[in-house]
Amino acid sequence: GFGHTRLEGPAVDSYWFPDYMADLDALLDHYAGERKVDLVGHSMGGNIAMMYAGVRPQRIEHLVNLEGFGMPETRPAQAPGRYAQWMDEIKTVQRGGKALKSYADADGVARRLMKTNPRLSEDKAQWLAQHWARPNAQGLWEILGDPAHKITSAQLYRVDEALAIYERITAPALAREASGDSL
């Protein structure tokens, strides 16, 4: 997550989607042991929750998916271009080209959040800004994210594979999609 999982060590070039499921598995091992859990995910987290619930159905009591409905279908012919794009984006990140924007203060972060989501109230944006960013050594507020998350995956999304995993979900599931579009 943002801000609470920073580790010292070498930078990561990119992330592989199954790593997120393995991270979730480790978190559940640590915090829930053998107990079943209620799992809620939003957007990419909803995709992770759905995949995890199908791969480890015995661990999930209830599943809530908020706007995590997979990705567009891909075709094998897209693979060469996708791998080239992935390699190019890794080089860009290594040169600092995908660095996350810095802000003069927490208010700037809050304004950025409200611009992205006009329905977000100022008090909620201020609260999020304090948890989503922190000041660096120069006093600028940096988003607590890893630019490597912005890299396009080299792997193509396989809808048939995802559907086969979804078929294994045994927990009662609730899926929700927003009715408004603020973009």
PLM regions and their residue ranges:
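Active-site loop/turn elements of alpha/beta-hydrolase fold enzymes
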Residues: 1, 7, 68, 178-180
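Active-site loop/oxyanion-hole signature of alpha/beta-hydrolase fold enzymes
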Residues: 1-40
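A catalytic-pocket lid/entrance helix-loop region that shapes and gates access to the active site
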Residues: 66-101
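Helix-loop "lid/cap" segments that line or gate small-molecule binding pockets
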Residues: 94-99, 108-120, 131-133, 150-154
